[in-house]
Swiss-Prot record:
This is Translation initiation factor IF-2. One of the essential components for the initiation of protein synthesis. Protects formylmethionyl-tRNA from spontaneous hydrolysis and promotes its binding to the 30S ribosomal subunits. Also involved in the hydrolysis of GTP during the formation of the 70S ribosomal complex. Residues 180-183 are annotated as: G4. One of its GO terms (molecular function) is GTP binding. Residues 71-239 form the tr-type G domain. Pfam families: EF-G_D2, GTP_EFTU, GTP_EFTU_D2, IF-2, IF2_N. It comes from Thermus thermophilus (strain ATCC 27634 / DSM 579 / HB8). GTP binds at residues 80-87, 126-130, 180-183.
């Protein structure tokens, strides 16, 4: 940009001229009047400062605006090992006999419902397993604020418990641990707490920050404490939403009903949806014909935190699809079609660039600016697993941290693939063969899945790739010094220093710095190095030479020219 007058810049920035003059005073920029001309660099500095100040003001204003919004209920997902009491807890919470209706007490479908207490409302999402929860997260939707991990007091932490924890953490949910079945004679809550501490979750009663609540979903003991803790955590996190914003929600589940047609279970996150609204969710679109809550009550509108069933989609939306309000049917159709085309193009692109080696995975990780290498480990025995973990724990570097999301005995599962896709992780299997369906799933999702028969083959591959990914470390190596003893000026006006090399050597291609009274006054490169008017590549200690520098013309007798180079430190 060219020079600009102060009053012109004020107009450009939408400021009063006096306001800009005051800003220039603060910046120490000299001027005579509002008609004075600013140098290009000063004008650009003003633009940047004003932009920064306005950005900060907007951020503060947005924070203040959010604080003035009404609170929304926390959204909670209940996860854990099969038969540890997830459905029984949900059943107790909503006071319906769902646990008896469902086969074997295992949840069959995703549901969402509200629990109203004197302290506030909590929205519970019921997933058939953490796979569905992770699938929702993969589609970019932050659904649950809090994950309650249910652990049976008699069984303790099981493989599915660890998977549930890993999936909840990958989804960015806050964790609460509910130790269930404390009414049983064989219950051992302290054992569960010890197991949690072994995994880095220290309960609050022992000085940590892990929230652990003992409960009995069967009798209801401790369930009120759990609800109070959920609401306390929600108050600390300060969940808020704007009921007047443009409506937005997320699909939890969809199904085709013989009588009603397509039914979508939706959680409203912002704004208020109303019957008659046109909506688009992923590649599906439609007009809301009816909304019902979890109890089957008809709703004309649904605001933030509401969980409702929606009728009116033309085709099945997917779990995790974001539901958006659109002005009319034509816009809904157009957006859905565009997304179909975008998906096809994206699938082709992803197919072409799926990581097939650890190096490719690391390269992708570096391009994203991540500093962690996420791994899922599977092994044939607990001993092998512990040995691999123990060795890998020492292989993290300052540049790349090895982060083991999940480590379990047994072959990789489809659940592992979903977690790996969500967290951009690699699955490394030792001494176990993944089933064909898992290999196929990994190929479809672009997840790196590798098997090993020798522990050190696995460790060496990770070690070499991490080392190859580290930022190179350099140290300075001084090559030599030359003392300026005479100064000559060429016909071109440029100075040349007549020097004596007093230490080491001065190479022609080295970087140099000029020292005066021990202080660095300039740093750059040599423009010319001569002996008796002949260009030379290098001058050794004890010899005289003439040195011209690229961009420096202020030599004084007694100055020292020091040559140096940066040398990479071996890994």
């Amino acid at each position: 940009m060219a020079k600009v007058r102060i009053y012109q810049l004020a107009k450009e920035l939408g400021m009063e001229t006096q306001e800009l003059l005051e800003l220039l005073d603060q910046m120490g920029v000299a001027y005579k009047s509002h008609a004075s001309t600013l140098e290009e660099k000063d004008a650009e500095a003003v633009r940047e400062l004003v932009k920064e100040q306005r950005g900060l003001q907007e951020k503060l204003a947005e924070e203040e605006r959010r604080k003035s919004l009404p609170r929304r209920p926390p959204v909670v997902v209940i996860m854990g090992h099969v038969d540890h009491g997830k459905t029984t807890l949900l059943d107790y919470l909503r006071k319906s006999r769902i646990a008896e209706k469902e086969a074997g007490g295992i949840t069959q479908h995703v549901g969402a419902f509200e629990v109203k207490t004197p302290q506030g409302t909590v929205v519970f999402i019921d997933t058939p397993g953490h796979e569905a929860f992770t699938t929702i997260r993969q589609r970019g939707a932050k659904v649950a604020d809090i994950a309650v991990i249910v652990i049976a007091a008699d069984d303790g932490i099981m493989p599915q418990t660890e998977e549930a924890i890993a999936h909840a953490k990958a989804a960015g949910a806050k964790l609460i641990f509910a130790i269930n079945k404390i009414d049983l004679p064989q219950a051992d809550p302290e054992k569960v707490k010890r197991q949690l501490m072994e995994r880095g979750f220290v309960p609050e009663e022992y000085g940590g920050d892990a929230i652990v609540i003992p409960i009995s979903a069967k009798t209801g003991q401790g369930v009120q404490d759990l609800l109070e803790m959920i609401l306390l955590l929600a108050e600390l996190e300060d969940y808020r939403a704007d009921p007047n914003a443009e409506p937005r929600g997320v699909i939890l589940e969809s199904k085709l009903d013989k009588q009603a047609g397509i039914i979508a279970n939706m959680l409203v996150q912002e704004g208020t949806f109303r019957v008659g609204d046109y909506v688009v969710a992923g590649e599906a679109y439609g007009r809301i014909r009816a909304m019902m809550d979890a109890d089957g009550n008809q709703r004309k509108e649904a605001g933030p935190g509401s969980a409702v069933q929606v009728l009116g989609f033309q085709e099945l939306p997917h779990a995790g699809d974001v539901v958006e309000w659109v002005p009319d049917l034509e816009a809904a159709k157009e957006i859905a079609e565009e997304r179909k085309e975008e998906r096809k193009a994206r699938e082709e692109e992803e197919k072409a660039r799926r990581p097939r080696t650890m190096a490719e995975l690391l390269r992708a990780m570096q391009e994203e600016g991540r500093k962690e290498l996420n791994l899922i480990l599977r092994a044939d025995t607990q001993g092998s697993l512990e040995a691999i973990q123990h060795i890998l724990a020492r292989e993290s570097t300052e540049d790349v941290k090895i982060n083991i999301l999940l480590a379990q005995v047994g072959a990789p599962t489809e659940s592992d693939v979903l977690l790996a896709q969500t967290a951009n992780a690699a699955i490394l299997a030792f001494g176990v063969n993944p089933p064909g369906s898992v290999k196929k799933k990994a190929e479809e999702k672009g997840v790196l899945l590798k098997t090993f028969r020798i522990i050190y083959d696995l460790v060496d591959e990770v070690r070499n790739m991490v080392k190859g990914q580290r930022e190179p470390q350099y140290k300075e190596e001084v090559l030599g010094q030359a003392e300026v003893r005479a100064i000559f000026r060429l016909p071109t006006g440029k100075q040349v220093a007549g020097c004596m090399v007093t230490q080491g050597r001065i190479p022609r291609n080295a970087e140099v710095r000029v020292l005066r009274d021990g202080q660095v006054i300039w740093q750059g490169r040599i423009a010319s190095l001569k002996r008796f008017k002949e260009d030379v590549r290098e001058v050794a200690q004890g010899y005289e030479c003439g040195i011209g520098l690229d961009g420096f013309d202020d030599f004084r007798e007694g100055d020292v020219i020091e040559a140096f180079q940066m040398v990479e430190v071996p890994a």
